[in-house]
């Protein structure tokens, strides 16, 4: 019954794989709750910074920070792309890269050059493979990233924008909607869109020392860093959610495969037993 032994071996192999996918699913389910908590905790800071930027920008009417000024001609575009370090997350990273390449193409058609800063091993490997000009990279941030880990690569792009080497900067990441939905997001980071630094009312009561322009100079960089950090946290939550869903689907498929193989094994065993009985009956009749 060699066929039966082969089927049993395959069933055992699929069962072992199912143990791995179930374990990964449970680990991701545990991590996603912590990732959501970190994401929600950091949101108020980013929102408060956004409001302060709006107040400062309107208070300093005679000074325009470079991060707020739209440039007439865009010769070079920079992208900060956030991905996961690990795989087994369904199409999370590939969908993000596909969206980005679609957004990049119109700029390339206009003759603009492209610079990329990557956060995450998957993005780094992808853009090296397609030979895009990478000017900075950071990987292995872990499940609890800190903003200090990001300051270096963010500074690379901010300096390039300030020095006029890059005329526009975009932030590309997976936005966490819910456990089942993660959306590839593509947002303009620099210059800040007008809606980002305008507020509806002028009824704030702030005193700026030494003046609004000086405060704006210091706050603006912190604000950009907070936006990127928030995007990283969103991407981490998206990664765990996508992996949990992917591993559940893999476990379900393994269950179906085991059921199918078990049925095939039972049929093969039944056929072998029937054959043995037939041979015994035939032998007895001959005697």
Curated annotation (Swiss-Prot):
InterPro entries: ATP_synth_F1_ATPase_gsu (IPR035968), ATP_synth_F1_gsu (IPR000131), ATP_synth_F1_gsu_CS (IPR023632). Belongs to the ATPase gamma chain family. One of its GO terms (cellular component) is proton-transporting ATP synthase complex. The keyword Membrane applies. F-type ATPases have 2 components, CF(1) - the catalytic core - and CF(0) - the membrane proton channel. CF(1) has five subunits: alpha(3), beta(3), gamma(1), delta(1), epsilon(1). CF(0) has three main subunits: a, b and c. It comes from Xanthomonas campestris pv. campestris (strain ATCC 33913 / DSM 3586 / NCPPB 528 / LMG 568 / P 25). It is found in: Cell inner membrane. Keywords: ATP synthesis, Cell inner membrane, Cell membrane, CF(1), Hydrogen ion transport, Ion transport, Membrane, Transport. This is ATP synthase gamma chain. It is a peripheral membrane protein. It holds the Pfam family ATP-synt.
